[in-house]
Every structure is written in C-alpha cells, then in structure tokens.
C-alpha cells in the first residue's frame, strides 16, 4: 500500500517546502524506498509556460515536455528521478478540464461546484499513477489561509479522512522569526498557522520549524504544548549555507525516521555516502572562480535556478566555489563592458525570449569571443552567439533573428515555417514550441563529443526558433564547428569555436539534467576552462 505525505506551509511563503519535500524524498530513497514527489500549485495559470520569469521564476521542463514549477527541479536533482507531466498540476489546469467536461455534458446536468467536482479532480490527480511507489509526497503551493489554496486543502483533508493515519501523513512547515531585541524565537505565528490548518480540518502530524538559529529543547517543548504535537515530531529546520546541506540536516534531525515511525515501518539504515561526499567537497572548496551571468531577468535570480545549480554542481566536482556575478544585460555598452566584466573567468548567457536586452547581450558575447574568455551560450544564448558571429566576424551586418520581426538577414528562423507571426497567440503558443527531450547526434572529435564521451545524447528543449542552415557553409569557412544536430539534421544543436579557449553554444537546456552528484558534462568542461583561465590570469 502506498503511503501519502502532504507538505504544507504557513506564516510566509518561500520557506522551503520544495526543498523539504525533495530532501525527505531523497532520505526515504536512501533507505531503499521508491518515492514520487508532486507539486500542486493554486494559481489560475494552466502552467507557468507563459508566465513572466520575473513573476514566477524558472520554467522547469521535463523529459515529456511539461512546463512546470522550479520545485520539480529540486525533486529531480535530489532524487535523480526524472519528473513528468503527472507530477504537476495547477488550479488553471483543473478548471480547464472541469469546464471542458461540463461543456461535453460529462457531469450529466448536475450543478458543478468546487466541492465535490474541483476537489475530486485534485484527489484523482493525487491518487493516480501510484503504481510502483512506496511513498507519494505532495507539496501544496502557497500558504495555509490563501483563498486560492482552499480546494487543495479540502481535497487532502478528504484523502486523510479516507486513508486514516496508517497511510496518510501531514507535514506543516512554519517560520519561527527571531526578534533580535528580545533575543528569542517567536512561536506565536506558528501557533496561528497550525490553528488555521486545524480550522479547515487538518491536524499536522509533523511540524517542521524554520529558524535562523538553533531551537532549544525548551522552545520545542513549548511548541509541542501550544500546537498539540508531540515534541518528538517537532523538527527543527535551521538555515544552511548551501541547499545541499539540507538533506543531511534533516537526517540528523531524524525527519526520515520519524516518518517511518509514524507509519509503523521498520527503520532501515540509510545509504548517504554520495551526499556525505558532496558535503566534504563543499567543505574542501577553498578556491573560487568568477562566472558572469548575462541576465535579462536579473531582478529575480530564481529565473535561472537550474543554471545556478548546474554551475554549483560543476564547482562541487572540482571543489571550487562559484562566485556568480550578475550582469544586467540592458545596461551593458561598449563603453562600460571592460569595467563590468573585470576579473571574470567565464561568461554564460542563459535562455530567454524577446528583444529586450539583446543588444547588451551581443556586446558581452563579442567581448568573450574577442578576449578569449570561456563562453557558454544556452538556447537563446546560442542564437545570439550566432548573430554576434555573423555581424562581427563574418561581416553580415544586418544579421537578425526572425523572433524580433525586423528586416534583415535571418540567421535565426522559425522551426515551423508554416506558422505565421499573426498566428502565434496565447491560444496556440504551445504548438509552436519544441518542448521536452529530443535525441541529438554529435560530431566525433569535437568539444561536445569529448565532453559527453558519446556521439548520441538526449537533452531537453524549450524553443521555437533555430539556426538557419543556409548559413552553415559560410560559418564553417570562418572556423565555426557545428558539432551537434537533431536526428533529422534539420536543427543545429551545438556550435563551437575550437580555436578559442572554450566557446560553446547549445540550443537545448543542459542545466535541467545536472545533478549535485552527477554534474552535467558541458558545465564541467565550462568550469574547467574558467579555472584554467583564472590560473593563467
């Protein structure tokens, strides 16, 4: 029988419910259990695919092409298990299905209501696709008390009532704010959060308390008394310097064993060798390398969450700290770039959409190429790299991307040529996007082939434009190597400038497949080049 664990949050948002769910999944996995982690988001968007990165953060793409919340990236990175479209749902997707079914007459003329019809869809999502798993961990987005989340809390209340405690566990994550003037952690917000949860019929079984300093036994006992939870099941979650220290911190707090004890499951030893190795590597990371991220969504670093993590994974691999330097691409000019990129060891241009900030980004790419600084362009970053090369190396001064709808020589063109600009609307925007994992063939003896140690790979994509193959010959005459292609050879996947120290652009998103214990080969090689550049300068 599968066991369900629901992770909810209170007091404030962004407490780390996703990291808690991912950490618990990893810890249970380390004991030999099969675990699936899912995210239920209360917002009305069908998925985050069309949301502004400044509003939502990164859109995490799964192998099967689902555009999901960045928390699924945490789930994958911690467990090593690929997420899929069945691991994420939103209120928007629920209402979309509900209204479609209502129009088709599937409700047989009854009055369609939040209870039971919306809650039934939520329950079906949670209770479906459970075969082969010992635990299903469901993270409920937002905080208790949010009006958008009420149907989700009602649905999991009903599930808990049906399955009873033998197969259902509620974990509630709260904040214990530290008031410096009083020199104490405040428990009152946690009391109110638990009270709000109980008011809708859910009594938390485990209370995870986030705090910036250690929680004393006296404070734990007080929380236990006031929240009516045994002190054994009040788990401290103290701030950590690095997110990869969180799972072991939870293990040291006994979270995994408490879950097993609650379910009356025999406690087995944990195999955590690879995580202890990560911790040791982090402790041994005394040297650092400076990487500039040329960002158009610089106001919210979570817009590049997987890129940041993938760089850290490569840093862990080499026992180096990655010192990220965030550069607002809109503010870059020929006049200030020397100052902005002073003492930089590597330049990375991540994915993005739209014309804004492209001028400054192209200036940064030119700076990397002409100064022989290690460069890594991802998706849009690769596309802009080809435009920079066309304009400044080959001499095609009017080189443009078709995405911006301007006159010029289209170095970057639509994947689907039959899709006119006027047809690209919110309604069919998904149909124009190449989403998910696709195979890619590599050319032997190239940077890419040497990095992957294979000629056949699979990587995840999220784009609707590609390199115009009509210009391949002229690019090759100027020293550019096309080292990766889609299986039908229609889409250029990787470009390289082998005469430079390390200059690589990829059409896909390698950051989505990087793990802390298995850094992505391209990020490994990029950081290696940056380390060597640092030593030479």
From Swiss-Prot:
Mg(2+) binds at residues 71, 139. Homotetramer. Its EC number is 6.3.4.2. Residues 290-536 form the Glutamine amidotransferase type-1 domain. It comes from Rickettsia conorii (strain ATCC VR-613 / Malish 7). Residues 1-265 are annotated as: Amidoligase domain. It catalyses: UTP + L-glutamine + ATP + H2O = CTP + L-glutamate + ADP + phosphate + 2 H(+); L-glutamine + H2O = L-glutamate + NH4(+); UTP + NH4(+) + ATP = CTP + ADP + phosphate + 2 H(+). Gene3D superfamilies: 3.40.50.880, P-loop containing nucleotide triphosphate hydrolases. This is CTP synthase. UTP binds at residues 13, 222. GO terms for molecular function: ATP binding; CTP synthase activity; glutaminase activity; identical protein binding; metal ion binding. The keyword Transcription regulation does not apply. ATP binds at residues 14-19, 71. Belongs to the CTP synthase family. GO terms for biological process: 'de novo' CTP biosynthetic process; pyrimidine nucleobase biosynthetic process. GO terms for cellular component: cytoophidium; cytoplasm. CTPSs have evolved a hybrid strategy for distinguishing between UTP and CTP. The overlapping regions of the product feedback inhibitory and substrate sites recognize a common feature in both compounds, the triphosphate moiety. To differentiate isosteric substrate and product pyrimidine rings, an additional pocket far from the expected kinase/ligase catalytic site, specifically recognizes the cytosine and ribose portions of the product inhibitor. Keywords: ATP-binding, Glutamine amidotransferase, Ligase, Magnesium, Metal-binding, Nucleotide-binding, Pyrimidine biosynthesis. Catalyzes the ATP-dependent amination of UTP to CTP with either L-glutamine or ammonia as the source of nitrogen. Regulates intracellular CTP levels through interactions with the four ribonucleotide triphosphates. InterPro entries: Class_I_gatase-like, CTP_synthase, CTP_synthase_N, GATASE, GATase1_CTP_Synthase, P-loop_NTPase.
């Amino acid at each position: 029988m599968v066991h369900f664990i629901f992770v909810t949050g209170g007091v404030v948002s962004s407490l780390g419910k996703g990291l808690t769910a991912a950490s618990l999944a990893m810890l249970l996995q380390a004991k030999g259990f099969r675990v699936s982690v899912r995210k239920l988001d209360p917002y009305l968007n069908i998925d985050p695919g069309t949301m502004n990165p400044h509003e939502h953060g990164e859109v995490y793409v799964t192998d099967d092409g689902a555009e999901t919340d960045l928390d699924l990236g945490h789930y994958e990175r911690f467990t090593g298990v690929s997420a899929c479209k069945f691991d994420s749902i939103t209120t928007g997707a629920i209402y979309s299905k509900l209204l479609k079914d209502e129009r088709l007459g599937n409700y047989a003329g009854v009055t369609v209501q939040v209870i039971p019809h919306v809650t039934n869809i939520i329950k079906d999502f949670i209770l479906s696709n459970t075969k082969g798993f010992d635990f299903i961990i469901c993270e409920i987005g937002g905080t208790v008390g949010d009006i958008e989340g009420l149907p989700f809390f009602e649905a999991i209340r009903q599930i808990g009532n049906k399955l009873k405690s033998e197969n259902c566990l509620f974990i509630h994550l709260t904040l214990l704010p530290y008031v410096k003037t009083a020199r104490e952690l405040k428990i009152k917000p946690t009391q109110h959060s638990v009270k709000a949860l109980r008011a809708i019929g859910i009594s938390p079984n485990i209370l995870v308390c986030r705090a910036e300093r250690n929680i004393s036994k006296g404070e734990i006992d007080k929380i236990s008394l006031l929240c009516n939870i045994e002190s054994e099941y009040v788990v401290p979650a103290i701030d950590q310097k690095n997110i990869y220290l969180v799972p072991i911190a939870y293990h040291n707090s006994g979270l995994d064993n408490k879950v097993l004890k609650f379910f009356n499951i025999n406690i087995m030893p944990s195999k955590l060798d690879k995580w202890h190795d990560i911790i040791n590597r982090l402790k041994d990371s005394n040297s650092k390398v400076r990487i500039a991220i040329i960002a158009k969504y610089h106001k919210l670093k979570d817009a590049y969450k997987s890129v940041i993590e993938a760089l850290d994974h490569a840093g862990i691999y080499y026992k180096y700290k990655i010192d990220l330097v965030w550069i607002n691409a809109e503010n870059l000019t020929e006049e200030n770039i020397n100052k902005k990129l002073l003492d930089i060891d590597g330049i990375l241009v991540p994915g993005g959409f739209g014309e804004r900030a492209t001028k400054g980004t192209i200036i940064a790419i030119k700076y990397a190429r002409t100064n022989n600084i290690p460069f890594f362009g991802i998706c849009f970053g690769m596309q802009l790299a080809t435009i920079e090369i066309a304009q400044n190396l080959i001499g095609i001064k009017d080189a443009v991307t078709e995405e911006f709808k301007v006159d010029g020589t289209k170095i970057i063109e639509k994947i689907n040529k039959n899709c006119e600009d006027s047809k690209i609307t919110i309604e069919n925007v998904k149909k124009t996007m190449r989403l998910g994992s696709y195979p890619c063939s590599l050319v032997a003896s190239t940077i890419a082939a040497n990095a992957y140690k294979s000629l056949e790979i699979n990587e995840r994509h999220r784009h609707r434009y590609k390199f115009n193959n009509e210009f391949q010959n002229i690019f090759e005459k100027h020293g550019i190597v096309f080292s990766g292609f889609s299986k039908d050879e229609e889409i250029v996947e990787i470009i390289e400038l082998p005469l430079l120290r390390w200059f690589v652009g990829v059409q896909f998103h390698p950051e989505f497949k990087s793990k802390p214990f298995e850094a992505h080969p391209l990020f490994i090689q990029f950081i290696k080049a940056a380390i060597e550049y640092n030593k030479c300068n």
